[in-house]
Structures are given as C-alpha cells and as structure tokens.
Amino acid sequence: MAIFGVLMPAINIPRLNLLDFIGDDHVKQHAFSQELGKAFNDTGFVMIANHGLDASRIDELYKQIQAFFSLPEESKRNYEIPGLFGQRGYTGKGREKAKDALTPDLKEFWQCGQTVLDDDPVRHDYPENIMVSELQDFNDILREVYAQLEETGKQLLRAIARYLDLSDSYFDKHVHNGNSILRALHYFPITDPDSIAPDAVRSAEHEDINLITLLIGASADGLEVLTRDGTWFPVKAQGEDIVVNVGDMLQRLTNNVLKSTTHRVVNPPRELLGTSRFSVPFFLHPKSNMDLTCLDSCIKEDNPKQYADMTAGEYLDERLREIGLKM
C-alpha cells in the first residue's frame, strides 16, 4: 500500500530529525528546539524524521485499519458505544463535523486511548479501550503505535519547553497518563456524488483541540494547510516522515506564540470520489486538570493576554460539544 508522507515546497514546512534532540549532542539539541519552535511560530507545522515507526509497522497499521473498515456495517456498529462521545471505539458516518460547520464530514473513524498501568487516580476517569473480536492484530498494532507516538510526542514537548525557556520536563507531569487519542480515519468512497450535500467534504477546515498532533502519512492526497496570508496549500507525499502540528491547547497556553494552523481534507476529483482515503493522527492531550492559563512569559505589551483561564478538561468538553460528539 502506498503511504503518503509530506513534502510541501510551496510553503516552508521544515524537516527535522528527532535523533538530533534525543541524542547527546547539546548543540544539535538546541538547534532542534529552536527550529521546532520557529516552525510552530511561523506555520504551526513541521515534518519529523526518525520518529520510531519504520515502514513495515506503518504498512501493517494500514493493512489492519483497512481490514476493520472493510467489516460489514452491522459489525462496525457493534463497536459504537453510546455515552463515550466517540472517545473509544467506532464512530459512524455523519457523526462528526468541524466547529461552526453545518454539514458532517464524509468520514468514519476508530479511536483508542490511554491505558493507565500505574496507580494514578486518573485511571478512573478513562473508559476502557474497545477490542475488536474479529481482528486481534488490529488491536495489537494500535496499542503499539499509540505507545510509540506517545513517547515521540513527549520528546517533542520537551523540545518545545526548551524553546519556551521552560524546564525540559515542564510538560512531563501533564502528559503522563494524559488523555491522548489515536484515531484511525476512513474517508469512505462516495458512489453517488449527487447524493451528498453540496458543501460536504472529507474534513472541513478546522484546528485541532489538543497540545500537538502527530500525523502518520495518509493513503492518498487531500490534506491542505491554510497559510497566514489565507492561501490553501496541499501537503504532498514523501517517505516515512510524520507531520506534527500545534493544537489549540498549546496555542492557548503560549498566548499565540505557537500557532494552531487551520487545515482540511478536500474531496478528490469527481472521478476518484469512489476511492477510500485512510489516515492516522495521534492527538496528544494532557490530563484534564492541566491549567491552560497563558504563560506569563508569553504575555507582552505587544501580545496581551488573549484567552480566559481554563483547564484542559473544560476546554475539551467545550470543543466536543462544538463538533457534535457531545450533547
């Protein structure tokens, strides 16, 4: 299966090597954190190489995801659990929309979340992950990928903390056993284009809710990023890199020093509407009690405080209601 990574010559999204930060060379560590912070300030996006998942694991991941979404509709609906607000298991077609959008996105998805292995009291706050009885390999690969992307995300947050002149460990306690989500997305085929709403798209323009998002390359084109001057640019394909972008929680915390960038997934040309697109983002969330009050160091005379004080849990609840997953 051809997996699409990222290369966007029309916009400056830098490519960074994570080994530069997790190695012992302090000069490379500093350069990595500075380049990461600058990218998140300029565009909100960066490409990361050597993130811990090789091509064979990514291929296996997409193989299992395709297998799940190929199950009969009735079988998939058995894993859609009322009351979980899409945070675990299956969410069917037409259930989620972008903030302020009227028409649901043309997608279905599966989500798995945190498994707390220690005695952290937060373990009582999270629902158990749903296991697919027909596909044990699907369960296994999602757990493996979740663990790897969570570790990669923690390293990136340490680099961000350094860029912000915070302790490298600033985010550690907040994301240990955090409310992070791995989402397997299927943008399903449209066999009758005339049957969908004129404004229906695979994923309407939006910003992510969380701290940072780590996106494994998709199976087809379609992802577009909105630049600061209001121009949409496609994210094209290359290699095994992942795309990492700033979410709204990090933007709030840094008072817009690090920017959450608007993005979307557009429909393919009409002749390709009958094809699927698969994608796997990892939404790195903190624990719900993390204080998102703007950092004092990010409040300046020319950048006054932009946001009301709020916890991560309060903000997540607000956004889940806005996108239609929670009533």
Predicted features and spans:
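Peripheral, non-catalytic segments flanking oxidoreductase cores
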Residues: 2-327
